Design a protein with these regions (language model features):
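Short intrinsically disordered coil segments
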Residues: 51-53, 98-104, 182-187, 216-218, ...
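Short, acidic/charged, Gly/Pro-enriched secondary-structure junctions
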Residues: 1-8, 39-73, 103-117, 261-284, ...
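Charged- and aromatic-enriched interaction segments used to assemble
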Residues: 80, 84-193
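Extracytoplasmic
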Residues: 18, 31-33, 63, 78-80, ...
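Assembly/oligomerization scaffold segments
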Residues: 1-96, 152-155, 160, 173-189
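Oligomerization/assembly interface segments of phage tail-like spikes and tubes
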Residues: 25-42, 79-90, 201, 252-260, ...
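Acidic, small/polar-enriched beta strand-loop surface segments
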Residues: 1-5, 148, 152, 160-297, ...
Length: 309
């Protein structure tokens, strides 16, 4: 695997072949991340200090786009440089929005105001039309929080970045079947902490109270209630937001971590059908994280999964 970094002035600096690397892609809840290591000449090291954008290429295909957060050089007979950073979501996370209130706001307006100005031009939105009659943006929240919050409000999929840097607002379409013979290891986890089973929304304008419960989560023996207040006549939006908050809080209730040899071809949000009798995991899961790693000797792929809703 090789890569290159770009400077603010447009200079493209090719990098030597990586001696070790780790690429992590997520479903958009957090930023993707990378760490690569390679031998360096002293003249290249000086140029690398100006690099801000990072691209990794494997087999002729772009497998990661991101920003360089940190560079480290070690000298012992020769220079070895380590670059690490985040995916393109970092551009949205590092820029805050001013306070604003919108009426009849649609997805394209959100992208024009909070996404495209930060150099993110490749965008694919599926479904919709995604719009809401009223939304407030608190001052000081990040542009990523604005985009994520709008998508939750209107019921759009969670935004995420493809390996080639495309911002995708769409549901996963890939499907995979995995069994014990495909894995090096598997870890199952049940975590009830933070799970919400009931969300009440109090409308300050009408005095109405909407209650949303999840009987499936209650069957786990969990009793956890949250309150929220809203104003305005959009009760259906409040209830939809309540369901979204319950679903978001339950994301980590039932999770799996699978490790496989080599590089496994998959995308975050793809569906995985598992057959792991030893862990009593014989159902559908959704990929939330993909970590490809090469330690200098062998390559492995780790998949983070959550139970499919």
């Amino acid at each position: 695997m090789r890569g290159e970094v770009h400077t603010p002035g447009g200079e493209i600096i090719p990098l030597p072949e990586f001696t070790a690397w780790r690429l992590i892609h997520t479903d958009g809840r957090s930023a993707d991340s990378f760490e690569v290591r390679f031998p360096t000449r002293e003249d290249l090291l000086v140029r690398l200090l100006r690099g801000v954008n990072f691209y990794a290429v494997d087999g002729g295909a772009t497998v990661f786009c991101g920003v360089v957060d940190e560079a480290e050089a070690i000298w012992a007979d020769e220079y070895t440089t380590t670059l690490c950073g985040r995916g393109l979501a970092a551009r949205l996370m590092d820029n805050q929005a001013g306070g604003a209130q919108f009426f009849n706001l649609d997805m394209n307006s959100v992208l024009d105001r909070y996404v495209r100005p930060f150099g993110i031009g490749q965008i694919r939105v599926e479904g919709g039309p995604w719009r809401t009659q009223m939304v407030s943006v608190p001052a000081g929240c990040s542009c990523k929080q604005v985009l994520d919050g709008f998508c939750r409000l209107v019921g759009a999929p969670q935004p995420r970045f493809d390996p080639d840097g495309t911002l995708r607002i769409a549901r996963g379409q890939g499907s995979h079947i995995l069994g014990e013979e495909d894995l090096l290891s598997a870890k199952w986890r049940l975590c009830r902490y933070g799970v919400i089973t009931e969300q009440q929304v109090h409308d300050l304008t009408t005095g109405a109270v909407s209650v949303v419960r999840d009987p499936v989560l209650e069957s786990y023996g969990i009793r956890s209630r949250r309150f929220a207040t809203r104003s305005g006549p959009f009760t259906h939006v409040n209830e939809r937001s309540a369901r979204a908050r319950i679903a978001e809080a339950a994301r980590d209730l039932n999770t799996l971590e699978l490790t496989m040899p080599g590089g496994y071809s998959a995308r975050c949000c793809d569906t995985v059908r598992l057959s792991l009798p030893a862990l009593r995991a014989e159902e559908d899961y959704v990929i939330t994280e993909i970590c490809r790693r090469f330690d200098g000797l062998s390559e492995t792929t780790r998949l983070g999964l959550r139970a499919k809703e």
